[in-house]
Amino acid sequence: MAFEDIPFLQYLGNAVDILLVWYVIYKLIMVIRGTKAVQLLKGIVVIVLVRMASQYLGLSTLQWLMDQAITWGFLAIIIIFQPELRRALEQLGRGRFFSRSGTPVEEAQQKTIEAITKAINYMAKRRIGALLTIERDTGMGDYIETGIPLNAKVSSELLINIFIPNTPLHDGAVIMKNNEIAAAACYLPLSESPFISKELGTRHRAAVGISEVTDSLTIIVSEETGGVSVAKNGDLHRELTEEALKEMLEAEFKKNTRDTSSNRWYWRGKKNG
């Protein structure tokens, strides 16, 4: 008995066929999402719709033009979409095309985390003082206005260059907002807490101070010791390792997508205050 002679198996095969096609289309969309290919894809959809409308309305000349555009369009797609097609083929070769991939937001967050971690580690080894504040739910517009607006994409190179001693922007804090560097050389309020160790300087007091009035997270690199600290909710956590900092940033950036029961803070260091 042939496969086609069994109605249930035929329907099941059709369903699997449709699901596979839709899955491949979905993965292709995820590959080109956020690139210029999206706009070109919209143009192709418009051409196809015009072609269908011209056929329905009997507009033979317009239909012929659309047929030519579609015919030559396939060659144009290969040329124009070359970077996206190459990336898709590379992912297919590495076996990642059919694996679960993060959303564009998650991918942007991961790149930001890696850039911050790399920059902080570089500056800590060389004892380059740094003060980096990440905005969360509480707006920090008033503090951003005290600095120099950048609205720049986050990169480890840019962060390092900002905090290089004797450069125009090194004095003050960098404030990040929505995975971007909103401003540099910003002024933060100093904490008056008596529980902060007297051995700590202005950067640490500013970090604790901003964490007392907002829900932001602030990373500090000491220029005296190269130690890395984080201030949050009025508490200062010191002597964080590179791994601990990265884990903490991942927990913070992904808190909205994680279960409440697993959304806790893990620290590898000693708490001051």
Curated annotation (Swiss-Prot):
The keyword Membrane applies. One of 3 paralogous diadenylate cyclases (DAC) in this bacteria, catalyzing the condensation of 2 ATP molecules into cyclic di-AMP (c-di-AMP). Upon expression in E.coli leads to c-di-AMP synthesis. Probably the main producer of c-di-AMP for the cell; is probably implicated in control of peptidoglycan synthesis. In B.subtilis c-di-AMP is a second messenger that mediates growth, DNA repair and cell wall homeostasis; it is toxic when present in excess. Belongs to the adenylate cyclase family. DacA/CdaA subfamily. GO terms for cellular component: plasma membrane. It is found in: Cell membrane. GO terms for molecular function: adenylate cyclase activity; ATP binding; diadenylate cyclase activity. It comes from Bacillus subtilis (strain 168). Its EC number is 2.7.7.85. One of its GO terms (biological process) is cAMP biosynthetic process. Disruption phenotype: Increased sensitivity to the beta-lactam antibiotic cefuroxime (CEF), upon overexpression of the c-di-AMP phosphodiesterase GdpP greatly increased sensitivity to CEF. Double disA-cdaA mutants cannot be made, suggesting they are lethal, while double disA-cdaS and cdaA-cdaS mutants are viable. Depletion of cdaA in double disA-cdaA deletion cells leads to cell lysis. Exponentially growing cells are extremely sensitive to H(2)O(2), no change in response to methyl methanesulfonate. This is Cyclic di-AMP synthase CdaA. Keywords: ATP-binding, Cell membrane, Membrane, Nucleotide-binding, Nucleotidyltransferase, Transferase, Transmembrane, Transmembrane helix. It comes from the Bacteria. Gene3D superfamilies: DNA integrity scanning protein, DisA, N-terminal domain. It is a multi-pass membrane protein. It catalyses: 2 ATP = 3',3'-c-di-AMP + 2 diphosphate. The chain crosses the membrane at residues 12-32, 40-60, 61-81. InterPro entries: C-di-AMP_synthase, CdaA, CdaA_N, DisA, DNA_integrity_DisA_N_sf, DNA_integrity_scan_DisA_N. Induction: Constitutively expressed, part of the cdaA-cdaR-glmM-glmS operon. Its main location: membrane. The keyword Transmembrane helix applies. Probably a homodimer. Interacts with CdaR. May interact with GlmM. DAC activity is stimulated about 20-fold in E.coli by coexpression with CdaR. Residues 82-242 form the DAC domain.
